[in-house]
From Swiss-Prot:
Contains 4 disulfide bonds. It comes from Hastula hectica. This is Augerpeptide hheTx5. Expressed by the venom duct. It is found in: Secreted. Keywords: Disulfide bond, Secreted, Toxin. The cysteine framework is XV (C-C-CC-C-C-C-C).
Length: 35
C-alpha cells in the first residue's frame, strides 16, 4: 500500500478507507493516516 506522506492531500495517498484529508490553517489540505 502507498505510504501517505505529510503535505498536500493527494488522492493516491489519501485512501479514504485509511486516511482523512484535513484542512489545516497555513498548511492547506494534508493527509492524516492511521498506521
Amino acid at each position: 500500500n502507498e505510504v501517505c506522506p505529510p503535505g498536500r492531500c493527494e488522492p493516491y495517498c489519501c485512501d479514504p478507507r485509511k486516511c482523512k484529508c484535513l484542512s489545516i490553517d497555513f498548511y492547506g489540505l494534508v493527509c492524516n493516516c492511521d498506521s
